[in-house]
Structures are given as C-alpha cells and as structure tokens.
C-alpha cells in the first residue's frame, strides 16, 4: 500500500516549472528637419515722384524640429547689382529695393551675407520681412519683378 501511495503521489505532483526571459531593444533616431513656406512681397503701384519710400512685407514660415538650430538667408534675386537688390521690367530697366528684418527697415538683409538665426520649436515660426523701394527713381512705367531664393540651413 505504501508503494502504491508513493507512486500515486509522484504521478500527481506537477513537474517543476521553468521560465526563460529575453530582451527587446527599442530605438528610433529623430533627424532634424525643416519645412519652409513663403509669401510674396508686392509693393503695389508707385510713382517716382512720391515723397516717401514704397513699403511692402513678406512672411517666411519655418517649421523645424524642436531645438534644431537653423538660419534663414536670402540671395540677391535675379537682378542684383552687387549687394543692391533690383526688380527688372525685362527691358533693361531696374527699380532698386531693399529688404530688412525690422519694421523700421534699418536692419537690412544683405544678399548671401546676413543670416537670421533661429531655434526650432517644432511648431510654425513666422519671420516677417520688410521691403522698401526708395523714392526718386527715374524709370519707365511698367511692371517690375524679381525672384529671391530663401535658404534654410540646419
């Protein structure tokens, strides 16, 4: 009887359980990014006899990764003469203009020289540009245009 009981107890007891573990490493690499949008600067209508400069504005909206350092830069446009920005009527006539980063138009942004330093917030950031066409320019009537390339370096 004892042998039968021992055999029955041995069969009824569960085998010792075993547990194994493993690790899964989880990673991601976030790379800095910037997206840019611009608005046109339109000076409207202008006569060379106006007593004050003609003024215009434009916005550059940048969305850069959080804490990403970046700079905004402007080239001289299609018709620059050295550091002087110019719009052309396509017939060899030019209207001078400048772009500044302040409403008083004293902090001029020289082509490919002056950069606007910023730090990304991960949200859209608007940088307003302030344009000025000096009065007293003696040019033929017509439509004058230019195209500026905006560069974001990050």
Residues covered by each model-derived region:
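N-terminal signal peptide c-region/cleavage motif recognized by signal peptidases
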Residues: 10-14
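Predominantly extracellular/luminal cell-surface or secreted proteins
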Residues: 75-77, 98-102
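Bacterial N-terminal signal peptides that target proteins for export
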Residues: 1-3
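N-terminal small/polar-rich segments of proteins
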Residues: 17-89, 114-154
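Solvent-exposed adhesion/ligand-recognition segments of exported proteins
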Residues: 107-112
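Extracellular acidic loop/turn motifs
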Residues: 67-69, 103-106
């Amino acid at each position: 009887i004892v042998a039968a009981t021992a055999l029955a107890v041995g069969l009824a007891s569960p085998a010792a359980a075993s547990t194994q573990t493993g690790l899964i490493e989880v990673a991601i690499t976030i790379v800095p990014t910037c997206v840019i949008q611009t608005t046109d600067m339109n000076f409207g209508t202008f006569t060379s006899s106006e007593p004050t400069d003609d003024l215009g504005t434009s916005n550059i909206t940048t969305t850069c990764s959080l804490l990403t350092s970046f700079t905004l830069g402007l080239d001289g446009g299609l018709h620059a003469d050295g550091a002087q920005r110019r719009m052309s009527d396509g017939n060899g006539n030019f209207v001078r203009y400048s772009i500044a980063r302040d409403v008083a138009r004293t902090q001029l942004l020289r082509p490919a020289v002056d950069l606007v330093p910023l730090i990304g917030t991960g949200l859209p950031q608007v940088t307003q540009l302030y344009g000025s066409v000096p009065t007293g320019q003696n040019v033929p009537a017509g439509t004058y245009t230019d195209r500026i390339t905006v560069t974001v370096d990050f």
